[in-house]
C-alpha cells in the first residue's frame, strides 16, 4: 500500500515480460483491471491502487495498525520476542503498544525493525572490490547531466562569491570506489491536464527561488521544454493523469539532501521529508511563475496541476517520500551484479522455521 498507493503507479515494474508477475501481485493488477472493465491494468492512479489494496485487507479480515512506528525490539537468543510501537502522530509513552509474535517481517523502506533487532546492515554503495562487481560504487552517468558552460558560482564568473545551492565542494572519488552516500529521493507526483480536475501550483510557504538558480542557468543553455522529457519523466495513466518522475540535470530529485535519512531518528527524517516537500512544490511554482523561465516553458508546465481527486487528505500531494534505498541487510546470501546478469544463481538453503521466531 505504501508503494503503489502513493507513488509507483506505472513504470517501476522494470520487467520485460508481464508473465513473470504471478501470485498476489498478478491478482492486484487484475483487480485494477476490474475497475476499468478490463482483464488487467498495469497503469493506474494512486486512489485506485489504494482502494484495491484496502480490498485485499478487508477480504483477509486483517487488523492494521496505521500511523505506528517502532521504538524498540526485544531480542533473546537471536530471536525477536516482541516489538514496541508508538503513534507517529502522538509520539509519547501513553501511545506505546507491545506486539508479540512468532515471526516478524520487515517490509519497510527504512528497515527500522532490522536495525532495532541488531541485525547487521550497510548504508551507501559498496566499492567494486567488495563483491567483485564493476557497476557499483562511484560512477559517471550519461544521464541527468548539465550542459557545458553552466556557471556554478553565486555570482557568475566569480569563484569567491560561493557556490549555488545544491553544489557540494567535495572532490569526486575514484570510479568504482565505495562511500556512504545513497541515491537521491523524490516524490512521485500525480498531475493532470484536465482543467476540471485540477489545482494550480501554488507558492509554498518556505519558497526559496535560489534553490532553482542552477536550473534557470541550464534552461538558458538548453532548449529545455516539457514535451521532450528533458525536465520530467511523464508516465501516462488513465483519467488524464500522469505519474511524474525525475529527469534532467535538476528535476524532482533533491540530490544530496538525504544522506542522514537512513540512520536518522524520526525528527531528522521528518525534517528531510519536509525539505523535499518544500523543494518539490517550489520547483513547480518556479517553472510556472519565475521570469527566468521562458514564457513558452512556463505555459507548457502551467497546462498541468495537482489532480484534485488524488491524495484528498494531504493537499493533493503524495503521502510517501520515494526512499529509493536506505539500509541493506547483510544476510546469509547477498544479491550482487552477477545475479542480475545471470552469471550466478542463489542455491536454495534451509532457513530457520518461522515457528522458531526467526527474523526476516
Q: Which residues does each predicted region cover?
A:
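Surface-exposed charge patches
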Residues: 1, 55, 112
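Conserved small/polar residues in nucleotide/adenosyl-binding loops
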Residues: 3-12, 349-354
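Structured loop/turn residues at beta-strand edges in well-structured enzyme cores
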Residues: 4, 78, 99-102
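Conserved N-terminal/central alpha/beta ligand/cofactor-binding core
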Residues: 6-7, 11-72, 76, 122, ...
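Short low-complexity, flexible loop/linker segments enriched in glycine and/or proline
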Residues: 11, 80-81, 136-140
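Conserved beta-strand-loop-beta-strand element in the redox core of flavoprotein oxidoreductases
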Residues: 76-97
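Flavin (FAD/FMN)-binding glycine-rich loop and adjacent Rossmann-like elements that form
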Residues: 91-103, 107-351, 355, 360
Amino acid at each position: 500500500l505504501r508503494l503503489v498507493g502513493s507513488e509507483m503507479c506505472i513504470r517501476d515494474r522494470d520487467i520485460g515480460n508481464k508473465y513473470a508477475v504471478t501470485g498476489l501481485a498478478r491478482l492486484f493488477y487484475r483487480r485494477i483491471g476490474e475497475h476499468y472493465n478490463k482483464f488487467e491494468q498495469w497503469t493506474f492512479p494512486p486512489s485506485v491502487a489504494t482502494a484495491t489494496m484496502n480490498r485485499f485487507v478487508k477480504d483477509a479480515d486483517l487488523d492494521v495498525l496505521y500511523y505506528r512506528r517502532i521504538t524498540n525490539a526485544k531480542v533473546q537468543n537471536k530471536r525477536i520476542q516482541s516489538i514496541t510501537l508508538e503513534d507517529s502522530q502522538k509520539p509519547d509513552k501513553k501511545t506505546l503498544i507491545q506486539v508479540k509474535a512468532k515471526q516478524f517481517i520487515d517490509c519497510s523502506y527504512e528497515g527500522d525493525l532490522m536495525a532495532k533487532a541488531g541485525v547487521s546492515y550497510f548504508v551507501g554503495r559498496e566499492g567494486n572490490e567488495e563483491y567483485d562487481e564493476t557497476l557499483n560504487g562511484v560512477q559517471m552517468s550519461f544521464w541527468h547531466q548539465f550542459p557545458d558552460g553552466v556557471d556554478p558560482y553565486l555570482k557568475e564568473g566569480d569563484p569567491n562569491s560561493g557556490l549555488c545551492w545544491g553544489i557540494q565542494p567535495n572532490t569526486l572519488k575514484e570510479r568504482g570506489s565505495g562511500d556512504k552516500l545513497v541515491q537521491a529521493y523524490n516524490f512521485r507526483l500525480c498531475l493532470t491536464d484536465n482543467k476540471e480536475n485540477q489545482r494550480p501550483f501554488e507558492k509554498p510557504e518556505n519558497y526559496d527561488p535560489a534553490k532553482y538558480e542552477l536550473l534557470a542557468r541550464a534552461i538558458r543553455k538548453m532548449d529545455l521544454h516539457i514535451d521532450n522529457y528533458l525536465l520530467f519523466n511523464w508516465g501516462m495513466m488513465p483519467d488524464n493523469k500522469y505519474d511524474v518522475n525525475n529527469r534532467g540535470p535538476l528535476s524532482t530529485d533533491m540530490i544530496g539532501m538525504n544522506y542522514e535519512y537512513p540512520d536518522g531518528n524520526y525528527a531528522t527524517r521528518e525534517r528531510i521529508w519536509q525539505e523535499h516537500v518544500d523543494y518539490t512544490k517550489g520547483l513547480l511554482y518556479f517553472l510556472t511563475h519565475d521570469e527566468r523561465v521562458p514564457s513558452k516553458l512556463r505555459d507548457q508546465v502551467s497546462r498541468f496541476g495537482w489532480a484534485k481527486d488524488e491524495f484528498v487528505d494531504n493537499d493533493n500531494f503524495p503521502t510517501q517520500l520515494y526512499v529509493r534505498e536506505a539500509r541493506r541487510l547483510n544476510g546469509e546470501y547477498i544479491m550482487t551484479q552477477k545475479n542480475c546478469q545471470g552469471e550466478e544463481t542463489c542455491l536454495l538453503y534451509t532457513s530457520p522455521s518461522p515457528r522458531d521466531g526467526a527474523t526476516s
